[in-house]
Amino acid sequence: ELKESASKITSHFFKEAIELCCISNGKCGKCSENCKFCSQSRYYNTEIQQSVLKSVDEFFKEAQANDKRGVHRFSIVTAGVRLSKAELKTIAQAYKKISSELKISCCGSLGLLDYDDFVMLKESGLKRYHNNLETSPNFFKEICTTHTMKQKEDTIALAKKAGLEICSGCILGMGESVEDRVDIALELRKLQVDSTPINILNPIKGTPLENRPTVHPDEVRRTIALFRHVLPKTVLRLAGGRLIIQKYFTDLYKYGINAEITGDMLTTAGLTVADDISAAISNQKILTKIEPIK
């Protein structure tokens, strides 16, 4: 019944639409924060190598390649709690070039920025800002202690004030309870987000969560259906950890998924754009950018 009603809700608001987005690992490693799931934290001994911010030309070429493949959104993602003003200027220049020359829509996940930063980025072509809440308010302190959920929610509020769409979601399998999953869905509804990425933890060696068991497929299905009921007008985006559920990911369309991060993730492998397009078409889906439902 949960599956059937979730499918009906998705069809009612989104028909058979499926949206594809991709991410660019704009700056990697040596993050000052201690999120227990993340291999980029300087607190943990992982194999991630630090990198400097990519150039405007590098960002543009990535966006251009994905635009040609039929991807609808391109997000620049950077490690660290925030970027320098010079780094933000480089990213703004990239957004300006991408938005003026390509069809692909610009997104960003650049940390805890301030209002003036968001205004500047929006004027440069940024459409949507991403900042994951990760988990419930109650469980958040078990995952990260170097910043708070309130800081994340304040950042989201500033991005909305600047006129940006919001993308915010969670990670399943970090040790949270079913109640925590309900709470994070309710928290996201309160924030009125436009898109919710649902990640499945991919335990990475060297992080505190390296020995966490993989989430059972039935838990993933039930959680997605739950989110669809709580967030009927929000795009539910299958995100990190996709290879863990590769064998049954198209089944998740029936539970409420109507978007996917395609290609490689930040520090783990993903599925190719061609794979995702083929899967969507074989399931009678229509590949298209989905605009926010107000």
For each predicted feature, which ranges?
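A general structural detector for well-ordered alpha-helical segments in enzyme core domains, enriched
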Residues: F59-E62, T90-I98, D117, Q151-L158, ...
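Conserved, mostly hydrophobic/aromatic
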Residues: A6, C35, I76, N131, ...
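Catalytic cores of alpha/beta
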Residues: L113-E123, M174-R189, L243-Y255
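N-terminal pre-triad scaffold of radical SAM enzymes
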Residues: K3-Y44, S51-K68, H72-S75
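Auxiliary Fe-S-binding modules of radical SAM enzymes
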Residues: R189-K294
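Anion (oxyanion) recognition and catalysis
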Residues: S99-S100, K160, I281
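Core AdoMet radical
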Residues: R42-F60, N66-I156, E165-G169, D194-N199, ...
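Conserved strand-turn element in the central/C-terminal portion of the radical SAM core barrel
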Residues: G80-S84, T155-E179, I198-P213, T234-I244
